[in-house]
Amino acid sequence: MASQLTDAFARKFYYLRLSITDVCNFRCTYCLPDGYKPGGVTNNGFLTVDEIRRVTRAFASLGTEKVRLTGGEPSLRRDFTDIIAAVGENDAIRQIAVTTNGYRLARDAASWREAGLTGVNVSVDSLDARQFHAITGQDKFRQVMAGIDAAFDAGFEKVKVNTVLMRDVNHHQLDTFLAWIQPRPIQLRFIELMETGEGSDLFRKHHISGQVLRDELIKRGWIHQLRQRSDGPAQVFCHPDYAGEIGLIMPYEKDFCATCNRLRVSSVGKLHLCLFGDGGVSLRDLLQDDAQQYALEERISDALREKKQTHFLHQSNTGITQNLSYIGG
């Protein structure tokens, strides 16, 4: 096995976010308000199952323990179950998760679990069906809620729910969310609205710091939990009276990048060192044959030397990320 992926700032990388499509059938106001518009995909299309098998094998050899499949909406891939199984061929990868809008979860949760999926994140920005429709452009609230129930029925012990925190939209609904997770083992993760190239106006209108919620949680007796090395960026809080947990993802907080442990590969095979970085390193030419694995590992390791210490969101520099479906959020 090659050495553990480590950058110039001694950060170790155990977590790969792998986008498998940039297509999405929802029109969320903060991501794709005008719906999906083709244009970012080359003639080669999205990564094939074999290419996904090779890239995850290389990352596993370099110390990756967790792979999250993202999009777009990953379940729009007809071969999604095969993709899960391909990633699971790597014994070193202990966790395989998906971030989904949940519209196919009720139908497919059991088959995904059987294929090897170990974790599910579902995007739910409101518990009010009408507001959910307004945010997502889809009248699918009850279908998504049924999907979360189906995930538990399929054997997932915990479901993570992602909620983008937006001023005057849902920031005042903490009590409603807390009542929902009190009897349920759901980790509800409030994610600060992030500025993207296409979303500057929305950001200025609706951004609110997660610190407001953190202060309120601490006041109510919620306790900050220790972070594991392959965990995502959320600060997680628990409370003895609740089956669920609260996570806060606050990319504008000081030192947010100090604990970065994740890298990204786009749906067309580009390595991105940061969600809000520039450019990207193409890996695709080294995903065509198993014999290329050593060269692939070398290219990944070499690219990591260029990873910056921090993003530049505070300067409104969003890099190449025009919207969050482009690389995989």
Swiss-Prot record:
The keyword Mitochondrion does not apply. This is GTP 3',8-cyclase. S-adenosyl-L-methionine binds at Y30, G72, S123, M194. [4Fe-4S] cluster 2 binds at C257, C260, C274. InterPro entries: Aldolase_TIM (IPR013785), Elp3/MiaA/NifB-like_rSAM (IPR006638), MoaA (IPR013483), MoaA_NifB_PqqE_Fe-S-bd_CS (IPR000385), MoaA_twitch (IPR010505), MoCo_biosynth_MoaA/MoaC (IPR050105), rSAM (IPR007197). It catalyses: GTP + AH2 + S-adenosyl-L-methionine = (8S)-3',8-cyclo-7,8-dihydroguanosine 5'-triphosphate + 5'-deoxyadenosine + L-methionine + A + H(+). The keyword Phosphoprotein does not apply. Residues 8-234 form the Radical SAM core domain. Belongs to the radical SAM superfamily. MoaA family. Pfam families: Mob_synth_C, Radical_SAM. Monomer and homodimer. [4Fe-4S] cluster 1 binds at C24, C28, C31. SMART domains: Elp3. It comes from Salmonella paratyphi B (strain ATCC BAA-1250 / SPB7).
